[in-house]
A protein has these predicted regions:
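Chalcogenol-based redox active-site neighborhoods
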Residues: 1-160
Length: 160
């Protein structure tokens, strides 16, 4: 069950990133403070749709998002920071940042999840994108369990 909605404050949760090769924590309050952020969730780094379509779409349109006043774009998944770092850095031209929801804090705080146990992945963050302005949720583009339409870079650009 989805626990967040437009005009809510984004939940203050802890993510992981690699800093000098070591996992470090970062809180959403640090990321979203006084910034316009697009947070894109994918079920898993290195998975086909995420790697071949979702992330490349945002890389391609990154400058267009900047022109619309977006400060940063973050991709998040229920992976560890080592996997997320390797995935994002496998795209040499990427200016996209990443967050690892290894402890599933975002999943639990938002309810935006998908059960991929049959595919060997377990319960993961679902595919979605959220536009956050200074910590306030302005729009949620939830794929509601599958597909890639609402949370695509092209759709977000049209709806900002």
């Amino acid at each position: 069950m989805v626990k967040i909605k437009v005009d809510d404050c984004f939940p203050d949760v802890t993510f992981f990133q690699l800093v000098d090769g070591n996992p470090k924590t970062i809180r959403t309050s640090d990321i979203f403070n006084e910034k316009k952020i697009i947070l894109v969730s994918v079920p898993g780094a290195f998975t086909p749709t995420c790697s071949n379509e979702h992330l490349p779409g945002y890389i391609k349109l990154f400058d267009e998002f900047k022109k619309k006043g977006i400060d940063d774009i973050y991709f998040v998944a229920s992976n560890d920071p080592f996997v997320m770092d390797a995935w994002i850095n496998s795209y040499s031209e990427s200016q996209i940042k990443y967050l690892a929801d290894s402890k599933l804090e975002l999943l639990n705080a938002t309810g935006l999840e998908i059960d991929l146990t049959v595919a060997g992945l377990g319960t993961r963050l679902s595919r979605f994108a959220i536009f956050v302005d200074n910590g306030l949720i302005k729009n949620i583009f939830d794929e509601e369990g599958g597909g890639l339409a609402k949370s695509s870079a092209e759709n977000l650009l049209k709806n900002l």
